[in-house]
Design a protein with these regions (language model features):
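Short, positively charged and aromatic/hydrophobic N-terminal segments
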Residues: 6, 10, 16-20, 24
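Hydrophobic faces of well-ordered beta-strands that scaffold small-molecule active sites
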Residues: 43-49, 76-78, 96-101, 129-133, ...
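Active-site-adjacent beta->alpha loops and helix N-cap segments on the catalytic face
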Residues: 78-94, 108-112, 138-158, 175-180, ...
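Glycine-rich phosphate-binding active-site loops on the catalytic face of alpha/beta enzymes
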Residues: 103, 123-140, 193-207, 239, ...
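Catalytic cores of alpha/beta
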Residues: 110-119, 175-186, 234-248
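Hydrophobic, well-structured mid-protein blocks that either form specific transmembrane helices
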Residues: 123-171
Length: 266
């Protein structure tokens, strides 16, 4: 009986993954463009330009924000304290700001997360594109999935009241396969818009980030119920294009790696 249940579950995952890839390929066919034919700007639209390092000076943050806007990145992912600094450089562009919430640990109280999210979506409605929050991966490791779901849902409900999409970071390098798969369903149940692999700031574990295996695992679990963002260790053009081939929706890429994945000569 157990073997049959495992077979059925594996088959469902495979079907969900195949359906997702089929839909993506149909969309590619509609535009009659392969990734190799896509312009730099079209490829940049997959990118959340990560400007999160705590040692960045305000001047560096402004320069990197301007760079991301010029390239046409989907968002500039920044720490909340720099929203006012970056806001003038976003207005009138296709690029939006994506602040992080309770980053990078996800260990604050639910009330604290909701309060931070509310400040951001109320104060920056004209420039905020999405909000990235960190799931409490210590509780995930402990198997406290109901608490994890409730925590995520509180922030998601707050953001959705103002039509702001939410991405949920798992920190997959700290989790095993079962934990990753179950957390995908926590996010679906909470109404999240994206599942996301990594913060890029985890210590004490080997850094693998958005591997093909992890992204496929997430895609299998969420199907068409949620989008998938890969983040962490996307540093080569080959990896970047491979994830696009897999049907990924978004990628978080650091400032040093953006020129590499976009094949820019600087």
């Amino acid at each position: 009986m157990f073997i049959n249940e495992q077979f059925v579950l594996a088959n469902k995952r495979k079907c969900a993954y195949n359906a997702r890839i089929r839909t993506k390929k149909e969309n590619y066919n509609e535009t009659s463009k392969q990734k190799s034919e896509m312009s730099t700007r079209e490829l940049a639209a997959y990118i959340d330009y990560s400007v999160l390092k705590p040692e960045f000076t305000p001047e560096q943050i402004v320069e990197l924000t301007k760079d991301g806007v010029e390239l046409g990145c989907a968002t500039i992912c920044i720490n909340p304290g720099y929203m006012d600094l970056c806001k003038p450089y976003i207005k009138g562009s296709e690029t939006k700001l994506c602040p992080v919430c309770d980053f990078p640990f996800g260990t604050s109280s639910t009330e604290s997360k909701v309060a931070q999210a509310k400040i951001l979506i109320d104060g920056y409605a004209d420039v905020i594109g999405e909000l990235d929050i960190v799931a409490n991966f210590g509780k995930i490791r402990a198997g406290l999935y109901e608490e994890v779901t409730a925590d995520i849902k509180a922030v998601v409900d707050t953001c959705h009241a103002k039509n702001v999409p939410v991405k949920v970071i798992f920190e997959t390098d700290a989790l095993n396969e079962e934990q990753i798969r179950k957390t995908c369903h926590c996010c679906i149940d909470a109404g999240a818009d994206f599942v996301k692999s990594s913060t890029g700031f985890l210590t004490g574990f080997e850094a693998h980030g958005a591997t093909v295996e992890v992204i496929k695992m997430m895609q299998e679990e969420v199907g068409d119920k949620c989008k998938v963002k890969g983040s962490g260790c996307i540093r080569t053009r080959e990896h970047f294009l491979e994830l696009i081939d897999m049907g990924i929706d978004r990628m978080g890429v650091g400032y040093r790696s953006v020129p590499v994945v976009l094949d820019l000569q600087r």
